[in-house]
Amino acid sequence: MLNKKDFLKYASKLAFPIMIQNLIGTLVNIADTVMLGYVSQTAMSASSLANQYTFILFCLYYGMATGTSVLCAQYWGKGDKKTVERILGLAERISLIVSLIFFVISFTMPVTVMKIFTNSPDTIAAGSEYLKVISFSFMFMGFSQVFMSALRSIGKIMLPSITYIVSLCVNVLCNATFIFGLFGFPKLGVTGVALGTVIARITEVFICLIYSLNSSDVRFRIKYFFAKSGILFQDFMKIATPAVINDVVWSFATSAFAAILGHIGDDMVAANAVAVMVVNIGAIACRGFSNATTIIISQELGKDQIDTAGEYGKRMLRITLAVSLIGCVIILAIRPLILDFYRDKLTETALSYLSIFIIMTTWRLVGEGINTCLICGCFRGGGDSRFGMIVDSIFMWLVAVPATFLAAYVFKLPPVWVYFVMTLDEFEKMPVVFIHYFRKKWLTNITRDFD
């Protein structure tokens, strides 16, 4: 067992590159939005609504990445490299099947998909063109997401970071080229953003394959892509399926919150949009350490070091709590700068809401940090993704969303108090999460002995 100082170095070594990857993902979205803003509001709306479809695919990828990460980390800790490669081949096969389904739907029926989200003819037309092009990125995106989750699970963090940086540069360069018609290319508008994304995803796969061909750690092998999986497939789905449902449930609840705020007024929506953006940047560190927790716990359990895994989980919880508090302090410190920046961009009412919302979302960040570390880090590291699915389904849809709805429409509380009720969601489920944590049933070695 590592001493506390060496453990902090090890955890930070895993977490910081993941934080960079998450930050880059945020920057890509910001860059797309800013550049599309120069095209038209219709282009921005079309891209945003079309991405609601791809968001469902992202949830599926995240579930597959969770199953890949947990199983690979445990078998890597056990020293079973062959099974790690079998898991990678299985996950890539599943991701390709899912990607093909989403590709066929978006490529052949883009108008039908867009009509689910809007009835604006201009937005439907632009979004349909966007979907037809970006659908080609799905197969590449699925491959790279699964491959990089496998690398992270065995502690190979730098390649995913480098890949994301290269992808960001390629994406931004291609977007600028195709949106503004640089270097002699025609101006493609929103279609150019989709084309830039496709090229960026192809670049990611190219880097992954080059690494795989020259790696002595883990390789993507065609024979495992087509091999029968049997019990390994069942183990994979047992972890991945609840993770997917968990993320979908959480995402729909977030959309329900947004709908409630949207019916209160535009000032609430605008203030919440800024507050969420700010707190998401602050949460990058928490999520980085949460992902590191999954890797650390899984590897120790794979080694059958149950007590060590439990102690490391306790240490990661303390680290994540400290990081969350630091994030809160930083956000509160820059709060005056944020308010000054938006002073001439928001109405006086929206600005007054934003001033209070930033405070509320920062203390909610502490709750999110704790729950994410335990549910997504410790519990999933032990192969227990089912608990998170159950607790989020119950507390989000039977407690948090109804409570916010009642506060807004039945008790008709002032908007700020409605927002306060909404931010209680992380703390409402926390007692149950801690009870599950202290029972330690999640400390499980889920590996098997294969020939």
Task: Label every PLM stretch briefly.
Residues M44-F107, M141-P160, A258, A271-R335, ...:
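Small-residue-rich hydrophobic transmembrane alpha-helices
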Residues M1-A15, C72-S137, F185-T241, I297-R364, ...:
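Short alpha-helical transmembrane segments in multi-pass integral membrane proteins
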Residues K13-D32, V133, S144, S167, ...:
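Transmembrane helical elements of multi-pass membrane transporters/channels
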Residues A65, I134-S153, P160-L168, V193-C208, ...:
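Short runs within selected transmembrane alpha-helices of multi-pass transporters and secretion channels
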